[in-house]
Structure formats: C-alpha cells, structure tokens
C-alpha cells in the first residue's frame, strides 16, 4: 500500500499536475495585487460589480488571494511538489544510475536486434577494435569473448542534479516566504530611523532592532538638468548609537548588512530654512503639487507680522536654488543657497531639506535559491554529455558489435562507423 502511494507521488504525471496547479495560482497572484490594504481591494473588486462575475474583495480575503505565496495551501503545494521530486529521485533516478553503472554484458547475438545500430564484422581483429574503442575514451569491461563499453556516465547524473536543485530552490522560496520581510521608509537627511513601516512579512519573520542614520542625500544632474542618479549616504548604528558600518547607495546598488538590503527608491523635498532680517531662523514645509508631469514643490512665506503679504517659493530640483514669486504671481528671481533676497525684509536661504525613500528587504532563503539555480545551470551543461554504450560479442570468426546513445544520435553513428572501418 505504502509502496503504491510513493510510486504515485514519484510519477512524472503527478509532478506535472502539481506544477501546473502551482503555476495557475502564481498567475492569480500576479494578476491580483498582493499585500495591499483592504480599501484597495474594496475599490478594485467591489461586491456590486464583480470581476469575471464572481471575484470580489470578500472572496479574495477569504481565500488569501491577497497574499497567495504565503498561504498554507500554496506552501503545501510547494512541499508536495518537492516530495514528488525527492521520491522520484530516490525511487527512479538513483536505481537508474545504479543500473547504468553495472556491466550489462550481452550473452547472445540475438540481443543486438534491439539496439539502435548494430552490425557484424569479419575483416577487423578483436584487439584492433578494442584499441579504437579505448582511443574514444570508453570504459571497457571484458568477460572472455564478450565486451561491454560505455562513456559519458556523468550525463546520467544530470536529472538527479535537476531534481536536487529544484528542491533547494523550493526550500529557499519557503524560507523566504515564511521569514522574509519588506519595509519602506521615507527619512529626512541627517535623521535616524528604525524599521517600522513593514509592508509584508511572513509568519516567522523577525524584524531586527537596527538603527540607520541618513548622513546625506544628493542628486546628480545632466547639463539639461535631468536626473542621472540619486544617492544616500547611510550609517548602520549599534544599540549605543555608534557607527558600525557606512555605505553609499544609489538606484540598483543597495547597501547590504547582516542579511538586510537597503535599496534607494525615491526622494522628496520636505522644506527649507530661511534667515530673516533679525537673524531669526524659520523652517517652512513644502507641499508636493499633484497631477504634474514633473516633481514640483511649493510653499508660502510671510514677509510681515500681519501675515497679509508674502512670497511663493517653487522648487523642482536639489541643485541649490528655488524660484521666488510675489503675491500676484510675478517672478522675482532665483534664490540660491546662502544668498539673500533683496526685498523690504531681506531673507537668506540657509538650507533645502530633503528626504530619501528607502526600501528595506530581507530574504533568508535567497542564497539557497541562487545555489539551486547554480546547480540547475551545472545540470544543463552536464546534460549535454552523451551517455553511449557499445556491446561486442565474438562468435567464432564473426564479431557482433552494436550500440546505443541517449542523445546526439548522428554523432554517435559517425563515431560507430569510424570504429568498424
């Protein structure tokens, strides 16, 4: 009974069926936005106008379609697929490899009829034939007048490595799903933050109590004032606030520390500091203008104590200046850092306050996934090694010779013809 169950699990058709089910749910997880707020699903999948006539936000939440890859049933499918690969390896691949390593001698000439290519020779001596076979790097086994030869046995290991690598990838995916996390932080320059805004995490996720300080943030521009890259200089701090590591990150070049990756994703301008005529310093917040093709920030500052007159300041970059307009919208001029604006009550621009957007990710299973893909690439290369077999039986004055190969049949036939010439 148990043996039949294991044979069914090890069956290729069962593995393909499970793989198709996993692929189908993966498509669902791609189509339906993952790890979004309930309001997002209520907006996109309302009860009154169901998608495809049946799909609404309550069904999505009920069956966990908002976090497909972390549900118990999806992880169970992955485990079942892994068990199928493992049992197939143990019950089919290893026995097949053991058989391939055995000396499979032919005892009768009738056995040559089932080979892909075979013939009988009269003009070629037995020792001369063995010498040619040896020159072609075959391993030769002999019992009196019968010979068995093979080469490329390592090619038979490729399916085992494929299964092994896929199991490693599945284990890595499960570990990442259960214990990884993704967070996002918007942090002003010179501020220190802890990981708090977690977007998604697994059942066994541990959020480390690490402190990170944003030392600096800057943007590089082309001559046409378009952005080429933006950078964040950040420091990893210990519990005492002392720096233990410092790295500069930019887009597609994250900082890595203790299994956590810090990615540069966004930026913002949050305010500016101005020095007034009486040397007092004021900080004004910026408002990001929506529905604009390019990023644009705006603020208003009062120029008198009655708050009935003031200036509008616009900024769209971090190149160290902003544009100033009066109360009727007339352009007055650009105000640069440490420069004073000559008006009735002069003001000096001290600093433009910016913030950096970071995405923080941890995936403990990613190394296993990379390792699995490495073995998968190795198995692909190994699979190109052809496993070839040759049988020889000497019967009186005749030499019967035949062979089989797993792939590259044409090349094997050419090699075979050269052997019997």
Swiss-Prot record:
**What parts of the sequence cross the membrane?**
12-32, 71-91, 157-177
How does the record say this protein sits in the membrane?
Multi-pass membrane protein
In its keyword annotation, does this UniProt entry include Transmembrane? yes
Pfam families xref list: ResB (PF05140)
Annotated signal sequence range: none
Top-level taxon of the source organism: Eukaryota
What biological processes does GO assign it? cytochrome complex assembly
Q: Which family does it belong to?
A: Belongs to the Ccs1/CcsB family.
Recorded protein name is Cytochrome c biogenesis protein Ccs1
Identify the taxonomic lineage of the organism of origin. Eukaryota, Sar, Stramenopiles, Ochrophyta, Bacillariophyta
């Amino acid at each position: 009974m148990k043996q039949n169950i294991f044979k069914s699990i090890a069956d290729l058709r069962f593995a393909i069926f499970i793989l198709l089910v996993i692929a189908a749910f993966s498509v669902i997880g791609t189509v339906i936005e993952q790890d979004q707020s309930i309001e997002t699903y209520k907006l996109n999948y309302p009860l009154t106008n169901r998608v495809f006539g049946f799909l609404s936000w309550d069904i999505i939440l009920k069956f966990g379609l908002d976090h497909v890859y972390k549900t118990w049933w999806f992880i169970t499918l992955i485990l079942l697929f892994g068990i199928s690969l493992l049992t197939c390896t143990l019950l089919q691949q290893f026995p097949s490899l053991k058989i391939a390593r055995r000396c499979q001698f032919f005892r009768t000439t009738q056995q040559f009829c089932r080979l892909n290519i075979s013939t009988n020779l009269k003009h070629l001596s037995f020792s001369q034939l063995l010498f040619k076979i040896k020159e072609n790097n075959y391993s030769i086994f002999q019992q009196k007048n019968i010979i068995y030869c093979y080469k490329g046995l390592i090619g038979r290991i490729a399916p085992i490595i494929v299964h092994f690598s896929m199991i490693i990838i599945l284990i890595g995916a499960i570990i990442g799903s259960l214990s990884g996390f993704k967070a996002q932080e918007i942090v002003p320059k010179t501020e220190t933050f802890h990981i708090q805004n977690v977007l998604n995490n697994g059942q066994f996720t541990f959020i480390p109590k690490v402190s990170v300080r944003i030392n600096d943030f800057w943007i590089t521009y082309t001559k046409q004032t378009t952005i080429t890259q933006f950078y964040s200089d950040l420091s990893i701090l210990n519990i005492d606030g002392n720096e233990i590591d410092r790295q500069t990150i930019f887009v597609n070049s994250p900082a890595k520390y203790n299994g956590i990756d810090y990615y540069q994703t966004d930026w913002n301008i949050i305010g500016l500091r101005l020095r007034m005529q009486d040397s007092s310093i004021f900080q004004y917040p910026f408002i990001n203008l929506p529905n604009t093709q390019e990023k644009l920030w705006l603020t208003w500052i009062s120029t008198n104590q009655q708050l009935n007159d003031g200036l509008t300041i616009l900024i769209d970059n971090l190149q160290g200046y902003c544009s100033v307009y009066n109360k009727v919208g007339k352009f007055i001029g650009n105000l640069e850092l440490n420069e004073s604006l000559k008006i009735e009550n002069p003001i000096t621009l001290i600093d433009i306050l910016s913030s950096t957007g970071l995405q923080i990710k941890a995936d403990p299973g990613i190394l296993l996934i990379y390792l699995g893909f490495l073995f998968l690439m190795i198995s692909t290369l190994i699979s190109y090694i052809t496993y070839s077999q040759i049988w020889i039986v000497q019967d009186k004055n005749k030499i019967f010779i035949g062979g089989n190969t797993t792939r590259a049949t044409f090349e094997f036939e050419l090699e075979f013809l050269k052997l019997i010439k």
